Each structure stands twice: as C-alpha cells, then as structure tokens.
Amino acid sequence: MEKTERKDLKKTLWVGLSCLIAFNIAILQALSILNPENPDESGVPYFFAVAAELFIIFVATNKKTQRQIFDVYCQPTAAKFFQWVCFLGLTQIIFSYNSTLIEMLLNFFHLSAQNQEESATGANETLSMFIYGSFLAPFGEEILFRGFLLQNFKRYGVRFAIIFSAILFGIYHGNIVQTPFAFILGLLLGYITVSYGLKYAIAVHIFNNMVLADFLDRFLQLFSENTATIISTIIMGSLALGGLYYLYRFWHTQRQKLF
C-alpha cells in the first residue's frame, strides 16, 4: 500500500470514528435535554444521533460522492430478494447457536449475556424505538458502513472492502452476542451493495430488523412458548436450509465474479 493510499485509509477511518463519537455524544446530549421517563425505551435520542452521524458524512464528502453512494449497478429480481431473505434466516440460525454457546461459556464463569441477547432479538416496546430500530438504524448504518466506508475501501479491492467494512460493522455493535452476527450480516449487505446498490442493502437491512426481528417476535407472542418455538423453528429452519442451498450455488457459480 502506497503512502497516499495509507493516508486516504486513515482519513476514512477517522471520519468513521468521528461518526461513532458524534452518534454517542448526540445520544447523551439528547438524554440530558429530553430526560425521558424510561431512557432505555425511548428511541427519540437516537433520532438525533443518526442525524449527527449523517451530518459528519455529509461534511466529509463532496456532492459527486454523495450522488455515487446511491448508484444502482443492477436491478435484483424477486427471486434474488428471496435468496437474500434465506441468507438472513441462515444468519439468524447462526446467531441463535452462537448466543447459546456464548451463554454456556459465560455461565461457566458465573456470568451471563442474556440481557444482551434479549435486547438484540426482542420486539421494540415503543413507537419511537420501532421507528429507530426498523428504519433509522438500518438507514444510518448502511450509509456509514456500506455507503461511506465500503465505497472508500473499494480502492483497495472489493474483497477487502466487503470484509473490512463487515468487521467494523461487527465491532460497532459492541457486544459478544451481536458482533459475530453483525459481521456475517455485513458480508451479505456488502455483497448486495457492490453488486446491486446501496438502496437494496438498506431494504434488506430494514427487512431483517422489522420483519425477522420485530414483527416475527410479536407474532410468536400470540402463542404458547412451546408452540412459538415450533413455529419459529419451522420458519427460520426453512429459510436457513434455503440459505445453505443458495450459498452452495453461489460458491460454485458466482464467487469468481466477485473475488
């Protein structure tokens, strides 16, 4: 890597770090000003945080770059979108087993990550948290990680851009339960971005958060625990099997085009 490339990489990482710092400062400031009765259940502070994050990116990019962020490279078919949903189901299954394994290991040391898992998988309790979790978070995260970071990393190679942005996306989630899942999800969203366009990655991210996380959890609450487990296993298991099948097909037919 040449000196100029290293300088550009450092600049990109500093902008990304500045976004995360601004995000957290905005949350703290909003909490101190609004002083909500139940801070953990209010999504309003996160509205300001996403705005601060996007403002940093806006300042750090020129108009040409801002337009290019939303370039569309290919129009996906309905069948392709279904494949992506199957991949989401596969990542959810991986997340479930990973969470169980981590919990077993932590319990051995009299620790637990149960609260982290519940916060990552449960339905949002308030309208503001639903709006943030289902729409604003996917939009803001995709603009930062796939729209800004990945696009800047592409000058060092597509494979590097997808993997490194996915690693940063995993670290960003900040806990041992979500990080592996976020990394795998980041790989999928990175592939979608470079192959089809950022707006499709945003759509898939919204579908994951709103449908597979929030709506599905609310739907399962209508049933007894045993029945809900069976329904969840059938739905996610079917998607995961489809994900494995499409992953096998991709590995044998499409990987050379990307790598």
Regions found by a protein language model. Give the residues of each.
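Transmembrane helix-loop-helix hairpins at the membrane interface
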Residues: 127-259
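N-terminal, membrane-interfacial amphipathic/helix-forming hydrophobic leader that caps
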Residues: 1-82, 93, 196, 211-259
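Short helix-terminus and kink motifs of transmembrane alpha helices
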Residues: 28, 32, 96-103, 146-147, ...
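Detector for Asparagine
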Residues: 24, 35-38, 62, 98, ...
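Juxtamembrane helix-loop-helix connectors linking adjacent transmembrane helices
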Residues: 36-41, 69-143
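Internal alpha-helical transmembrane segments of multi-pass membrane proteins, especially GPCRs
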Residues: 14, 18, 83-86, 132, ...
